[in-house]
Amino acid sequence: MMGSSSQELQTALTDISKTCHHMWEDSKDLQGRFVNDLAELQRLQCTITNFERAQHPEQAFQAKQAMTEMQKKATGVYEMLAQRRNEIISKLNDGANIASMMQGQLINDKLFTWKNAQKLAQIGMPFDDREQLLDEIQLEFEFLADNIWQLNMFACWMCDLCRRAPQLNDGLAQSSAAKLTTISEQLNRLLFVLVSQSFIVSVQPEPVLKTQHKFVTEVRLLIGDKLGIRQQLMNTNVSVKIIAEDEARVMSVDCDAQKEIRANKQVGSISNDFEKLTMDERGHLSAKFNNSKLTRIAHRKPPPKGASDMKCAANMQAATDQKYALLFFITPFQMGNLSKEEQLDVWTLSLPIMVTVHGSQDCDAQVAILWHRAFASISRDPNVHDVTAVSWENLAIMLRNKFSLFTGARRPLSESDLAYLSEKIIIPNMPDQKPITFTRFAKQAMREELAFSFWEWFFSIMQLIKQKLLKYWDEGWCIGFISKHDASQSMCMLPNTSFLLRFSDTQTGAVSIGFVCQDDDGQKVPFHLSPLTIKDLDQLSLASRIASCPQLKDIRYMYPNIDKEEMLRYFESEERHRVGGPESPGGYIQSEIVMVAKTNGNFRRASAAPSMFGADSPSPLSIQSKLDWSPGEIHQSMMEMTDELGHVLNVGGMDSMHPDANTLLGPAFKNPTFHPHDQQQHLQFVDMSHPQMMQQQHHGHNHNHTHNQFYPS
């Protein structure tokens, strides 16, 4: 049957189950006839003895003739019975082998593939047919449970039939019973594994759990209500505990270890840690944990005092390096004709998870679990080593899917976006590029002069988009992933002046406004405002900054040709609703923060000698440093600019016969030959106390203008 399709195997197993049923009925009938024939032979033997004692030779002779005929008949019945036993043993063997093959395909291929897709879905890989595929898998679990159970019933019934049959000297009944017992044990093991493996986490918890926060998860028993299991589970609970991932790996190798781990290896506390298995209208037998909360997690013990062993220090893991798993287990229960010593102890494990106690740990926790979800095996096989390096192509797929999942953006990362990202993580000027390691991706500084890794930079951008720039990103109003140099060149090449939004690559989680102005000679000069973070945009939204900046008022287009006013109209009603009416409840006139970029038309060539305290340079008395100024990277007429805002808001009988049955059958009895069958992620503050920086204009509605200054290229 190797290479057969699942449907062919199902058909074959169904046919075997039906055949075994008919064979068992035939065997029962033949054994009954054989027992009756033996009883008749015993009666004839007594009759002959009585006739001989009474000296009635003619009657004795007739009785002997009748006995000879009966012996022939009984022998024929016995031969057919022996043949039926051989046939049913062979069929049961075939059925067990097919069931084992199907079970291996179901668990090791189909369910494994589903679980792996479930894992990848947690980093954004599409898995829209998750429920449909799992329902199809459940149908196969139910089919196997039914057929394995039926085969086991026939094996047990035949074994009981053989044990209650006349025990002849040929030992056929005894050997048949032994073989049937072996088959039954094999089928029992298959059933144990099937039920155990049918218990899965159908809805995984979030990859990163935070203490004192609720989490949602669901477990499901895929054999459904087969074998009458729902009634067996009426008084049982599904419980959940959190254990270390190291212990979960031990359990994957030594299943018996789960009892000891379950009892003694608790690393945290979970409220509402048990639920009942319930059957819904779709036939799903599941337990939903919707109100559970991780209330406590044990901290790692510090190294012993005075420990100087470097290995000891290396083995110590930070909170964001420690992985955990949720252990789900059902109260042990008995099933069918299994003995009390063979109760089912069913459990399953979630995928590895991370636990944080503070939002500051989220970036590191997210990257550790992201790498696992993308590249690690779900089997917890100790012989499978963790993936420490991957190609850029595989990493790009992970980043693209994680980006869409995390931000909720409809617009995915484009090929140009990914090309820009690759420049940030692939070491330049190396023709023989090696795979990208986890350390390079998540730990190592993105560039030597920076204090953050590629992941920290990318994660903070995802946070910025999710919280502040989602509409800009989805509508294409934010180019985002483009270098300052390329942005400057692109804007200067357009016939009209324009501005764009790009993510800073020298600061985490920040967006910069780049635009072009014309100098006295009519040449376009690019400027890039100091990057704005989430905190900055909390105080004054990006739309408000764009709308209020005088230098952007005459620029009609966002790069390349997007109508600025159309974009601003989208935010107008939203901003008006946020700000409220012109007067506050106390009768005060509200103030308004306005972003002003001070250009005043004072553009100088790069060759011009700058003054010590020119109007285009930041004052040395300001808290603003040169790092706040952003060069445009165009070789002529370069200028830099930072925007400085005034911060004014806070924002399932028969008895044996005569033992000497062989003498009753006579010399015509032939022992049939029995052939045995052998059998798985700031605004810079201007020093407002300095008189040179106090440039405010008072209007009727009290607008506060804080001026940006330029640093010449």
From Swiss-Prot:
GO MF, any single term: RNA polymerase II cis-regulatory region sequence-specific DNA binding
Domain SH2: start-end pairs: 477-574
CDD domains for the chain: SH2_STAT_family, STAT_CCD, STAT_DBD
Pfam families given in the database record: STAT_alpha (PF01017), STAT_bind (PF02864), STAT_linker (PF21354)
Superkingdom to which the source organism belongs: Eukaryota
Family (UniProt): Belongs to the transcription factor STAT family.
Role noted for this protein: Carries out a dual function: signal transduction and activation of transcription. Activated STAT proteins play a role in repression of dauer formation. Neuronal expression is held in check by negative signals through the TGF-beta pathway that target the daf-3 transcription factor.
Protein name, UniProt field: Signal transducer and activator of transcription 1
Organism for this UniProt entry: Caenorhabditis briggsae
Classification of source organism: Eukaryota, Metazoa, Ecdysozoa, Nematoda, Chromadorea
